[in-house]
Structure formats: C-alpha cells, structure tokens
C-alpha cells in the first residue's frame, strides 16, 4: 500500500467521526518527525478551533484508529487547527474561500509557471478561477494542483 493509499484509508475511517462531532476534516498527514511517525489531523469549523476541540476529536479518533488499525507501526496522533494559511484540498474549499488570497502550486507549468498567487474567485467546471496579482484571471484545472493554501492577510 502506498503512502497516498494509506492516507485515503485513514481519511475514510476518521472523516465520519470528525463530522459527527461537528467538525470538518481539513487534512491528514502521516510523516516521520524526529525518528517517530506522526499522524497529524487538521480540523476546523466556523468558530475556530481551541484546545478542547482538539482534545475531544483526539480522544474519539484514538479509539477509532485502535479499532481499525490502519497504520502498521507505532505513531503519535496530533489533532490541530489548520492555521491561518490552511490548505485547500476539497472542491468545497475553493467555493467557501472565494474572495480570499491564495497561493497555488501546480504539478506542471501553466502559462510558463507553476506558482500562482492571487484572489480566489471560485470554482468553475473543475477549474479553480484565480485573479492573479500580476497577470489577470487564470483558470487552473483541479487535477493539476499540487498544493493550494490561503495566504495570511495582514
């Protein structure tokens, strides 16, 4: 099983539980840090995320992950807020955060570049529509996006 398949399996196990607790599952990472595996789960909801929220979700997921055992080695579970520069992963993210400043990196060059920054206009026919800071409106196919996240507005 690939790392991507493992993450997908974990998401399928935990997303219903996270949703039942009233939160959105934003992202899941399984990474090696300081010679330990870390399963990092990012959650959100409209009112922001506090320590009590993270603890509630962590306790619920701990038990659920023990039952399903999708990770064949020991790991540390961390639950946290996605932060101000949260990733945009799902179609609904590109709709919900329309009007916000974003950064998008693509797998391949589009119009001679792979990095785009600008104001997110929304989603249109499987394309993210972006008003870039320097070259006007661009449409980026969803399947070409390697990484997308909000930009911190000061």
UniProtKB/Swiss-Prot annotation:
GO (cellular component) term, any one: cytosol
CDD domains: YlxS_C
Localization: Cytoplasm
Domain of life: Bacteria
Alphabetic keyword roster: Cytoplasm, Ribosome biogenesis
Stored SUPFAM superfamilies: YhbC-like, C-terminal domain, YhbC-like, N-terminal domain
Keyword field contains ATP-binding: no
Keyword Disulfide bond: no
Any GO BP: ribosomal small subunit assembly
Biological role stated in the UniProt entry: Required for maturation of 30S ribosomal subunits.
PANTHER family in alphabetical order: RIBOSOME MATURATION FACTOR RIMP
UniProt similarity note: Belongs to the RimP family.
Record-given protein name: Ribosome maturation factor RimP
Organism of provenance: Natranaerobius thermophilus (strain ATCC BAA-1301 / DSM 18059 / JW/NM-WN-LF)
């Amino acid at each position: 099983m690939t790392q991507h398949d493992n993450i997908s399996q974990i998401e399928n196990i935990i997303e219903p539980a996270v949703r039942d607790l009233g939160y959105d599952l934003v992202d899941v990472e399984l990474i090696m840090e300081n010679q330990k595996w870390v399963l990092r789960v990012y959650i959100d909801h409209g009112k922001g995320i506090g320590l009590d929220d993270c603890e509630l979700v962590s306790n619920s997921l701990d038990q659920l992950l023990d039952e399903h055992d999708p990770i064949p080695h020991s790991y540390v579970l961390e639950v946290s807020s996605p932060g101000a520069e949260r990733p945009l992963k799902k179609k609904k993210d590109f709709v919900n955060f329309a009007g916000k400043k974003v950064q998008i990196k693509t797998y391949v060059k589009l119009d001679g570049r792979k990095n785009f920054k600008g104001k997110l206009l929304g989603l249109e026919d499987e394309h993210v529509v972006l008003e870039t800071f320097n070259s006007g409106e661009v449409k980026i196919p969803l399947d070409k996006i390697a990484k997308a996240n909000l930009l911190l507005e000061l």
